[in-house]
Every structure is written in structure tokens, then in C-alpha cells.
Amino acid sequence: MNNKTTLVVMAAGMGSRYGGLKQIDPIGPNGEIILDFSIYDAVKAGFDKAIFIIRRDIEKDFREMAGKRIENMIDTEYVFQDMDYLPAGRTVPQGRTKPWGTGHAVYCARDKADTPFALINADDYYGSSSFKLICDSLKNSDEMCMVGFKLGNTLTENGTVSRGVCETENGYLKSITEHTSLDRNSGIPLDTIVSMNMWGLTPKVFEYVERDFTEFLDNMQNPLKNEFYIPTVIDNMIHRYNYKIKVLDCTKKWYGVTYKEDRETVAKAMREKIGKGYYNGI
């Protein structure tokens, strides 16, 4: 039984498709952002602390538009995803400006996340049941896990999306394959389990993140563009080190803003939830 659990939030993404800092784009009727709803759900589920992984250049805006409210809801810490925070002996390739990716974000949190933790994207709405599923699993088991959503519950009408398509066996993750340009006509069954980067991890993961990140840096084909993703670490843990990653099935809808046009869909969904009595006192 693990008494303490932490929520680690990846909020440093540049939002290239959306064209702005979507993490701090108001979505609720009273100026709430998606993150407000996620933190509310996380606190209700039983998480004790939140760690935000951000870029230094958005710190002021992030604290102003999100941090101040969130700090009233939960114990909060910040971690900077600095380009030059790398394993010993490694340096940023000359001319590189692109962030290193989600695997590097997790690497940056290694000195702060000292309890079992859930990892999420700041700009995704996962829903209260997802946070309950993952918090209960982290508290009652030492197994790492992920929340799996049905592909059809994660698509947008406004364009194609990238998803980590999962193969499962007896309730555990067998493989995860990144598919780009998915929509309802891609030929993949809509009830296929996909990952939306909602992982339940323990501090043990950091040794694998560092090992794989070092290997990635030493073998980059394109030093200016290649990115290091957390699913790569998970896949290696399963296939190289025989780790078992439990899959927690979520049948609810996921919401996110991949395109600007998605914003109204998400805002409408949040208005409806608030109208039904969810998120009182947020």
C-alpha cells in the first residue's frame, strides 16, 4: 500500500499544431483551463501533490493563469524542461531548438517525483474516472500501469490525430505503436485501445528513462529534429526487461484541443458537466 501519490503534468509542449500556448487557453465558463479540471479530478481521486514540467519562458504566464489557482487546490512544485539538462557528458547539438520530447520531460522530473506518480499531458481532459482508476492502482499495487482509451473516444472531426495504438494481452500492455494521421476512416477499429499519455509509474522508471535517453542521444539520425518519447521507454521496459504494465480500461470520452476548432467542442462539454453539478467550487 502506497500512502502518497503525485501527479506529474507535462506542460512544456509548444503546441505546434494549435499555434499557441494551449495549456493556458481558457476553456471553462469562468476562465478555467483544461488543467483546472484535471487537478480538481486528481485531488478528488486522492493525489497529494502536483509537479508541473514547464519551460522557463512560460513560467510567468503559467503561474499567473494557472498556477495561482492550482496552488490553492494541491501542494505544487515546478520543474523546468531545459534543453541542456542532459545525462553526463552529453551536450545540445549546435543549432538544435526543438524540445527533446516527453521522455526528456520525465527525465527532468527525476529529482522531484519520489512517490508513485501519474503522468499526464497538461492540455488533455482525461475525466474523473481515469484519475480514480490510476490513483487507486498506484496506491494499491507496485505495478506500473496506463489508462487505455478507446480510439473512437479520442478522435476529432477537425482533422487527423496521432495516437499510440496498444496491443494488450490478459490486461497487460504487449506493445505500443505510434500512428499518425488517424481518423474514423483509417481502418483501425474504433474500440482499439490507445494511449493518451496517462501513465502510472514509480520512481524506478527514472533509471530506464536515463538509460534510454543516453542511448537515444548517442544514436540520433537527425540531431536537430529527433525526439525521445516516453512510450519508447515503456516499450523497452516490456521487451528488454520483461516489465509488466497493467492496462486500466476507460470507457469515457477524452477531450483535447489538437486544432483551434476543437476548442468549442471541449468548452461545450465542460459547460454541460458543470451544468450537471460536476466541478462545484473549482
Predicted regions located by residue number:
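Hydrophobic packing residues within well-ordered alpha-helices of enzyme cores
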Residues: 62-66, 134, 209, 266
